[in-house]
């Protein structure tokens, strides 16, 4: 009955429901509740179906053709009222989501809408409950990171160079001042500045930056207004000192800016590339995706039946995402390679994929406004994620991650075999050079028995990623079956 009314797009009059042929369970329930006479009217707003209006009576004939003529005239008013109610409900739901959860990934927004609606219904009924837990079970994780190699060393070197230059400028003011008016205190201060410079020549220790800047701001710079009166040479040197300090914090920010700009260029380029490719991956199959930028770009993917509103999921899409991830990591490696000529600081990028075939559960942490691994058993995955980029090959001092390569870390033999099939295809497509390194890793705290495959990205071959991806789904079918 309802299906018929919606398909026809017309008001449907049922004179006597007990004589209606082939009644569905819904219609049987209506008869049992005493409904005999009935009108079902589809409601449309801007040509889109938004609901149905039902009028019922226990007496056959109460609703007839004449009634329906009058009803047709007011149906648009009902449609507008329902649309307004739906908009108001959606506004309240979005307000709850924004307050409780901040921005939500589109792939899982449906689950948050359900939870928000349920919470609003409880509040309306006078039940002051918290929003229900949001947990997704049976989820397959994928994790990848493009890490700037030795970023801490480069950052410290930049800070060190800026501090030395800052001290040299201060020492120049003191020496010219002493040359103009030989006050022993100026010579003593110049000596202490030199001591700080000598210390920085050896290493930059924790706290050195704050100590040196405090020394300059507290003991040296307050003298400058008085020293200017010593003569034009001193005044010009002081003006040059202040002109060099570009930072609002009153520090020299030259080499550090070159480093920060280089890191930002890498991050923004890789992140933009990843966003473009992720949009294509979402079109293949919906999944949860997140990325973070620090000294490089890391991203996580969660996929599984419980993330899909209708619960339809096939392992094909999991294998497809794993292959897609490997291909995209190749693209990120090439993006990083192309940037080298534009970087003010010569930075290298290493790439890693963490493989896990065992599904896990994720829970939304309302206090932290983010998803996290749920359950103590699943925490091993998080531990490995945090420590794997520093892993070394067993029996050597060599880091697993190397510039221009992709390392795939796994713990089960079947995981390694599956990725070798992906690698063979990607090598044939021209993304990778021939050959695979099979290595065993040193034990990490909380994670033992890890292995890795390491491959080298083809940087010089002119390959087009889209050409290979056009046949990706069919390729994955062959690999799976």
Give, region by region, the residue ranges found by the protein language model.
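Amphipathic alpha-helical "output/dimerization" segments
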Residues: 62-83, 87-90
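Charge-dense, extended regions
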Residues: 233-481
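Conserved structured core elements
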Residues: 20, 24, 37, 49, ...
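Short beta-strand-to-loop transition segments that serve as allosteric relay/switch motifs
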Residues: 52-62
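Helix-to-coil/beta transition segments that act as allosteric "coupling" elements at the rims
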Residues: 24-50
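Charged, long alpha-helical assembly modules
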Residues: 145-286
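Regulatory sensory and allosteric helical modules in signal-transduction proteins
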Residues: 1-27
């Amino acid at each position: 009955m309802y299906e018929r009314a919606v398909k026809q797009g017309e008001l449907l009059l049922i004179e006597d429901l007990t004589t209606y042929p082939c009644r569905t369970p819904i219609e049987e329930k209506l008869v049992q509740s005493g409904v005999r006479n009935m009108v079902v009217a589809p409601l449309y707003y801007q040509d889109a179906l938004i609901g149905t209006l039902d009028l019922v009576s226990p007496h056959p004939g109460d609703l007839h053709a004449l009634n329906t003529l009058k009803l047709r005239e007011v149906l648009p008013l009902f449609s507008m009222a329902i649309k307004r109610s739906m908009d108001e409900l959606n506004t309240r739901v979005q307000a709850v989501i924004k307050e409780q959860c901040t921005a939500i990934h589109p792939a899982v927004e449906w689950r948050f809408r359900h939870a928000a609606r349920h919470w609003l219904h409880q509040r309306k009924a006078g039940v002051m409950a918290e929003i229900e837990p949001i947990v997704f079970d049976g989820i397959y994780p994928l994790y990848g990171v493009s890490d700037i190699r030795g970023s801490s060393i480069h950052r410290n070197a930049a800070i060190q160079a800026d501090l030395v230059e800052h001290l040299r400028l201060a020492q120049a003011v003191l020496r010219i001042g002493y040359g103009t008016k030989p006050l022993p205190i100026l010579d003593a201060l110049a000596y202490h500045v030199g001591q700080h410079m000598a210390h920085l020549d050896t290493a930059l220790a924790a706290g050195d930056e704050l100590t040196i800047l405090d020394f300059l701001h507290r003991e040296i710079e307050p003298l400058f207004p008085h020293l200017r009166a010593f003569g034009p040479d001193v005044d010009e040197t002081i003006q040059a000192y202040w002109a060099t300090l570009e930072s609002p914090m009153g520090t020299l920010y030259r080499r550090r800016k070159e480093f920060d700009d280089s890191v930002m260029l890498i991050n923004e380029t890789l992140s933009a590339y990843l966003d473009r490719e992720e949009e294509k991956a979402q079109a293949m199959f919906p999944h949860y995706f997140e990325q973070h930028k620090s000294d490089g770009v890391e991203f996580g993917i969660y996929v599984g039946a419980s993330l899909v509103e209708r619960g339809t999921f096939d392992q094909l899409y999991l294998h497809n995402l794993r292959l897609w991830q490997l291909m995209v990591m190749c693209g990120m490696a090439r993006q990083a390679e192309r940037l080298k000529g534009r970087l003010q600081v010569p930075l290298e990028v290493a790439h890693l994929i963490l493989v896990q075939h065992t599904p896990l559960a994720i829970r939304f942490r309302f206090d932290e406004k983010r998803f996290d691994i749920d359950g103590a058993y699943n925490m091993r995955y998080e531990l490995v994620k945090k420590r794997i980029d520093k892993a070394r090959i067993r029996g050597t001092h060599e880091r697993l991650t190397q510039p221009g390569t992709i390392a795939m870390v796994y713990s089960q033999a079947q995981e390694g075999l599956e990725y070798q099939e992906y690698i063979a295809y990607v090598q044939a497509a021209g993304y990778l050079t021939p050959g695979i390194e099979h290595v065993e890793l040193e034990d990490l705290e909380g994670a033992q028995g890890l292995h890795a495959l390491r491959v080298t990205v083809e940087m010089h071959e002119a390959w087009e990623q889209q050409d290979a991806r056009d046949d990706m789904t069919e390729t994955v079918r062959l690999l799976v079956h």
